[in-house]
Curated annotation (Swiss-Prot):
Gene Ontology, cellular component aspect: cytosol
CDD domains recorded: YlxS_C
Database matches in SUPFAM superfamilies: YhbC-like, C-terminal domain, YhbC-like, N-terminal domain
UniProt source species: Escherichia coli (strain K12)
Keywords for the protein's UniProt record, in alphabetical order: Cytoplasm, Ribosome biogenesis
Name of the featured protein: Ribosome maturation factor RimP
GO biological process terms held by the UniProt record: ribosomal small subunit assembly; ribosomal small subunit biogenesis; translation
Phenotype upon loss of function: Cells lacking this gene show a reduced growth rate, especially at high temperatures. They show a reduced amount of 70S ribosomes engaged in translation and a corresponding increase in the amount of free ribosomal subunits.
Main location: cytoplasm
Coiled coil, from the record: none
Assembly notes: Associates with free 30S subunits, but not with free 50S subunits or with mature ribosomes.
Alphabetical list of InterPro entries matching this protein: Ribosome_maturation_RimP (IPR003728), RimP_C (IPR028998), RimP_C_sf (IPR036847), RimP_N (IPR028989), RimP_N_sf (IPR035956)
Length: 150
């Protein structure tokens, strides 16, 4: 997670939780039109009105604090079937589920891995890939998503 993403997470966690939602995580994607993507969840699931309420509340906070110096679009959504994983707690919650990982730095000359989450030990994640356990540092995981099965 970048310094900006950490700062944004700290700023918007309380307002999101005050509305009764869990802040699953955020992504800030820089580009011609940058995007701040916020993932929320609740035990009852998420609907469009929930996303609109969170968007309105977060927009107010960001307008006052103004932490982003470039133009951006704000997107608020549920994590979806291919739920992104951001924290060790997320990985622990989904032990036994299939995941795709993209690493910051290659391990065994590979940056992309897919396997089943086997265990979480502090900041280390064990994933079974093709029958072999591979261990990854959470700090080396750039992006992780559950693999939906239909």
């Amino acid at each position: 997670m970048s310094t900006l993403e950490q700062k944004l997470t700290e700023m918007i966690t309380a307002p999101v939780e005050a509305l009764g939602f869990e802040l699953v995580g955020i992504e800030f994607i820089r580009g011609r039109t940058s995007t701040l993507r916020i993932y929320i969840d609740s035990e009852d699931g998420i609907n469009v009105d929930d996303c609109a309420d969170v968007s309105h509340q977060v927009s107010a906070v960001l307008d006052v604090e103004d932490p982003i110096t470039v133009a951006y679009n704000l997107e608020v959504s549920s994590p979806g079937l291919d739920r992104p994983l951001f924290t060790a707690e997320h990985y622990a919650r989904f032990v036994g589920e299939e995941v795709t990982l993209v690493l910051r730095m290659a391990v065994q000359n590979r940056r992309k891995w897919q396997g089943v989450i086997k265990a979480v030990d502090g900041e280390m994640i064990t994933v079974t890939v093709e029958g072999k356990d591979e261990v990854f540092a959470l700090s080396n995981i750039q992006k992780a998503n559950l693999v939906p099965h239909f």
